[in-house]
Each structure stands twice: as C-alpha cells, then as structure tokens.
A protein has these predicted regions:
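Long, terminal "pre-/pro-" and other extracytoplasmic accessory regions
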Residues: 1-185
Length: 185
C-alpha cells in the first residue's frame, strides 16, 4: 500500500522503477508514529504507516539538464506550492514561505542554477515552528519536483498565548532585574 501511495503521488517514479526495499521504522521524533520507507531503483519515499500520508521522497536519478532550462524561480515556486496544496492542503495552509539564502538554489558552476529549494515553516499562533513544515526542491531544467519533505510533529502541544508579554517588555524586565550597564575593567 505504501508503495502504491508513493507511486501515485510522485510523478517522477515511473512504472519501470522497481521497489528494491521496504522497511517499517519507528519515528525518532514521535514515539507513536511509524513510517514505511520504500527504496526504488533511483528514488526513495516514506509514508506514515497509520494515515498513509506521504512524508518524503527524493528522486536521485533526476538531474536532467534537458527541458525547461528557463524555468524561473517564481514558476518553480508555483509548481512547489501547487504540489503542497495537493499533497497536504491542511498543513500547507498552516505554513508560511521562508526564504533561506543558503539553500534556495543549487549550482554546479558559477551562474548555473540547477535546482530551486523552497522552505515553508509551520505557524502556530502566528509564531514560526522552525523545525516543522516542508522543504521542496524543483529541478530547473526538467521542471520536476525532485525532493519533498514534510516534518510535522502531530503530537506537539502548544501553550496558550494569553497574557504573553511583548518582546520589549521582556527586555525591560531582564534589564531591570539584571541591572545591565556599561563597565570598564
């Protein structure tokens, strides 16, 4: 079933790509979560064993330099967001785009952009949950999504935000309590 889910969700996994391995793994982050990890000839994917949700995939044979070599970053982002809306619409609606300058594009030579990577952080009560959300990579030349990862702690509990003080109030409190001042030694 996990293999079927991955094949149906990931356009780059073709009928000719054989499943070579399958493992049931316990999630390292959530003790009640189990994952099916399927290795294909040229790809990898993982699925939540209880819900059937696609959690990740990577097409490691897709490094094409043929095709839409002019795919813009904006078009690649549209493609990524369309995929996220299809695969995980409720979670995607709780996320916001975050541009990470270090990982946005991949180059094989100066000026040679081969892939665009996009990150989306989960938001809870208007606050970014940095280690939760999505990362997705689009190959510029083929236009294919070559990597997807959903890292989402379903069992996470969040404290209420009622009565939370502002950043400025917190700074003033610490400043008053600690008595910070300039000193010369």
């Amino acid at each position: 079933e996990a293999e079927r889910i991955i094949r149906n969700a990931v356009p780059g996994i073709t009928a000719s790509m054989k499943a070579e391995s399958a493992y049931l793994q316990k999630s390292y982050a959530e003790k009640d979560k189990y994952l099916w990890e399927i290795g294909f000839d040229g790809a990898y994917g993982s699925v939540n064993a209880k819900t059937g949700e696609l959690l990740s995939f990577y097409l490691y044979t897709e490094n094409s330099r043929k095709g839409l070599s002019s795919l813009s970053e904006a078009k690649a982002r549209e493609k990524a967001e369309s995929f996220l809306n299809k695969i995980a619409p409720e979670k995607f609606a709780q996320s916001r785009f975050y541009e990470s300058p270090d990982f946005v594009i991949y180059r094989t030579a100066p000026g040679d952009v081969t892939e665009y990577r996009f990150n989306y952080y989960r938001q809870v009560n208007g606050i970014d949950f940095v280690d939760n959300g999505f990362s997705i990579t689009v190959n510029r030349n083929s236009g294919m999504i070559v990597q997807y990862n959903c890292n989402w702690y379903d069992s996470a509990e969040f404290p209420a935000v009622d009565g939370v003080i502002t950043e400025e109030s917190a700074f003033d409190y610490i400043d008053d309590a600690a008595g910070f001042s300039l000193m010369y030694k």
